[in-house]
Regions:
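Single conserved hydrophobic/aromatic residue that forms the stacking wall/gate
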Residues: 291-301
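Signature of long, low-cysteine stretches enriched in small and polar/charged residues
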Residues: 39-42, 46-90, 198-259, 273
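A short acidic/glycine-rich loop-to-helix N-cap element
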Residues: 92-98, 262-285
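N-terminal mature-domain "stem" immediately C-terminal to a signal peptide or N-terminal signal-anchor/transmembrane
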Residues: 1-37
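Secretory pathway targeting signatures of secreted, lumenal, and periplasmic proteins
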Residues: 5, 9-13, 18, 144-204, ...
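N-terminal "mature-domain start" segment
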Residues: 1-2, 16, 25, 123-151, ...
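Short, well-ordered beta-strand elements
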Residues: 83-92, 169-174, 260-271
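Solvent-exposed alpha-helical segments and adjacent loops
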Residues: 1-10, 16, 65-127
Length: 301
């Protein structure tokens, strides 16, 4: 099944009225950091009578129970594995809408993390074997075998995968660790990105190179992932002096073990194509790789 999809089990009338509207507003809202609007989750409604047998095998399920006292609960691997099942109960439209609201934050978190885990699982099924460039860089990166080394020097590696009408990319460079990663705000991170773009990411035309798109301010947040401190930035890139652009997902990562900061970025070029699932794969690659720097780092703390 497609990444970031949810099966919603509810009767057709409810789906086409306020209950369906509420679920769509909360779960099919805009996925942050993409150049075109794409929904956060792809929703597929299924009436109760169709919810049996193989149709219960979706990884993510929201089941609306209209005949019980108001509450919500989660079950893991209820009908299949892996699976996150959310049951929302109520005995009136109002009480069901309230429970949808109450469960939203936890549910989005669980579904999002579950899909990153699923993406990691897919990566590990067929990982890239040639990792010499990463070994030289002291980084244990896991990525699908469809990626190949595109460019490398002593401070920079660039992997690329061809996709329909474009390519998906991961770059890694090292920064000295004098500066705390959380001292970077959006403006100083953009400045850093643009200088790295000028040094390492040329466009197709002479004197052209990748920069952050000026029209849209990126989203930024602090992340603690398995004990690793990271600054996450999502936004869109363009090429100065050329007509190219797309989404990026950037992490500044504290690598205490090697006394450095890693600048790791995934970016996608695929004009007029949907890019949400490509960005989710890049996030999974980066997070899967970072778990491997966390183990020795944690031991040292």
């Amino acid at each position: 099944a497609r990444i970031n999809s949810i099966t919603v089990v509810v009767d057709n009338d409810s789906w086409n009225s306020t209950i369906g509207d509420k679920i769509r507003n909360l779960y099919a809202d805009e996925y942050e950091g993409l150049p075109q609007i794409e929904e956060r989750f792809t929703l597929k409604q299924m009436p109760y009578e169709a919810f049996s047998g193989f149709s219960r095998s979706s990884r993510n399920i929201i089941f609306i129970n209209k005949k019980s006292n108001p509450e919500f609960f989660f079950e893991v691997d209820k009908y299949a594995r892996p699976q996150i099942y959310l049951e929302i109960k109520g005995n009136s439209i109002k009480s069901i809408l309230e429970q949808i609201d109450k469960s939203k934050k936890e549910a989005i978190n669980k579904f999002t993390n579950g899909e990153i885990e699923e993406s990691k699982r897919r990566i590990l099924k067929s990982p890239l074997k040639d990792t010499k460039a990463m070994d030289d860089f002291l980084i244990n990166m896991k990525m699908p075998s469809a990626y190949s080394l595109y460019k490398q020097d002593k401070n920079f590696i660039w992997y690329q995968k061809q996709i329909q009408k474009g390519h998906s990319n991961i770059i890694v460079t090292k920064l000295p660790s004098q500066k705390n990663i959380f001292d970077y705000n959006i403006q100083s991170l953009i400045k850093l990105r643009d200088s790295i773009g000028k040094s390492f990411l040329p466009g197709r035309n002479p004197e052209s190179f990748m920069i952050s798109e000026k029209e849209y301010l990126p989203y930024q947040k602090k992340v603690n992932y398995y004990g690793i401190k990271m600054l996450e930035t999502r936004g869109t890139w363009e090429v100065k002096g050329d007509f190219m652009g797309g989404p990026f997902l950037n992490y500044l990562v504290e690598d205490k073990l090697n006394d450095r900061v890693l600048f790791i970025e995934g970016f996608v070029f695929a004009p007029s194509k949907r890019k949400r699932d490509n960005i989710i794969e890049l996030e999974a690659i980066i997070k899967l790789s970072l778990i491997h720097i966390s183990e020795p780092t944690r031991l040292q703390q």
